[in-house]
Amino acid sequence: MAKKVTAYVKLQVAAGKANPSPPVGPALGQHGVNIMEFCKAFNAQTQGMEVGAPVPVIISVYSDRSFTFVMKTPPASFLLKKAAGITSGSGRPNTNKVGKVNRAQLEAIATTKLPDLTAADMDAAVRTIAGSARSMGLDVEGV
């Protein structure tokens, strides 16, 4: 018989830096999950990623207090800020432009994000990422 899911916990955790302190500890502790077991498993799976990159993770907690988790790709905003070399987006994206990204950078980001996007093909994924870039106050070249 399949285990019954009692909760889904959605978190954004820095790659390779999961530890029992907030936000991980309290979120998992209230469901009775072994926090250190999650931290070790998460850090092991994010070993190949850039350390410190925010990784969205969905943790399924079962009735016997065991868990499984699914990692997503880092947010588009994080990847765009890294590509443009900026620390934050614009407070007024339509008037204040804070950086530039070109089509090659957008394609690289879209390739990374493709498993999590609902885009039908690569061109649609690039347009989706370009829209995110524009809403952050970045100039988009070549799209």
Swiss-Prot record:
Q: Where are the transmembrane segments?
A: none
Molecular function per GO: large ribosomal subunit rRNA binding; structural constituent of ribosome
According to its UniProt entry, the protein's GO biological process terms are: translation
Cite a GO CC annotation.
Answer: cytosolic large ribosomal subunit
| Record PROSITE patterns | RIBOSOMAL_L11
Pfam families linked: Ribosomal_L11 (PF00298), Ribosomal_L11_N (PF03946)
The entry assigns this protein to a family as follows: Belongs to the universal ribosomal protein uL11 family.
Task: Sum up the protein's function in the record's words.
Answer: Forms part of the ribosomal stalk which helps the ribosome interact with GTP-bound translation factors.
Q: What is this protein's record name?
A: Large ribosomal subunit protein uL11
Q: Which gene encodes it?
A: rplK
